Amino acid sequence: MSDTTSTIIFEHPLNEKMRAWLRIESSLQQLTSQRHLNSLASSLAFFRTITELLEVLERGEVRSELLKELERQQAKLKQWAEIPDVDINIVNSFRLKLKERAIALSKAPRLGQSLKEDKIISLVRQRLSIPSGCCGFDLPTLHLWLHLPQSERDKMVAFWIDSLLPLQQALDSILELIRQSAIFRSEISKNGFHQNTAEGADLLRLRLPLTPLLFPQISGHKTRFAIRFLPLDSEKGSVPAHLPFELACC
């Protein structure tokens, strides 16, 4: 992805829960952008993303963790509503949205189950781990499916993506609030290194100038973190002795 912005935001999870949520968010965003399947290449990219998403969903208690977080965020909003001069209408609107997200998520079938049981998805998943294992002679079912009218394939893809809607809406609401929970503060790294504490934070967000083409290498956990800034060009690039950047511990 490229654009003309002068800054770039990097994010780093400080616990396994946030790591899984960011991976799920990334997969859901990819599925949305890949949903127009008009070739074997675009279809395999879509099915590969579904496979990666299902693997993440199978590893932990994603639904229960999200429901706990929705409840925690509602409790925080309830406290905010008691702050003098707060816009009570905005706070109540967010609380209502979180409540609706929690109800929809709790009532939804097992996350990803309908995708796992789908015949086309199941057949492709079995072949994706085999190098070039999705040729027409390997998957005649997929070969035939790709020759269905585009409208029929679009309808099936829409059904698959819509089955993930309770998950996507709950996760989007949670991550929006977490990202907005802390403001960016100015920091300066010395000789390409910075360390600090992040008590109670789930997510680090760094905003860097696009030039001089540096990226952060972050190590950390729920209480402390360290950032090493490295040049994109490891041979010719360099890191300023004092690098200004912005940091938010969310």
UniProtKB/Swiss-Prot annotation:
Keywords: Cell cycle, Cell division, Cytoplasm, Septation
Keyword Cell cycle appears in the UniProt entry: yes
Superkingdom assignment: Bacteria
HAMAP family: ZapD
CC annotations in GO: cell division site; cytoplasm
The protein's name: Cell division protein ZapD
Gene source species: Photorhabdus laumondii subsp. laumondii (strain DSM 15139 / CIP 105565 / TT01)
Protein role: Cell division factor that enhances FtsZ-ring assembly. Directly interacts with FtsZ and promotes bundling of FtsZ protofilaments, with a reduction in FtsZ GTPase activity.
Single GO BP term: FtsZ-dependent cytokinesis
Family matches, as SUPFAM superfamilies: YacF-like
InterPro entries attached to this UniProt entry: ZapD (IPR009777), ZapD_C (IPR027462), ZapD_sf (IPR036268)
Localization terms from the record: Cytoplasm
Family classification: Belongs to the ZapD family.
NCBIfam families according to UniProt: PRK05287.1-1 (NF003653)
Oligomer and partners: Interacts with FtsZ.
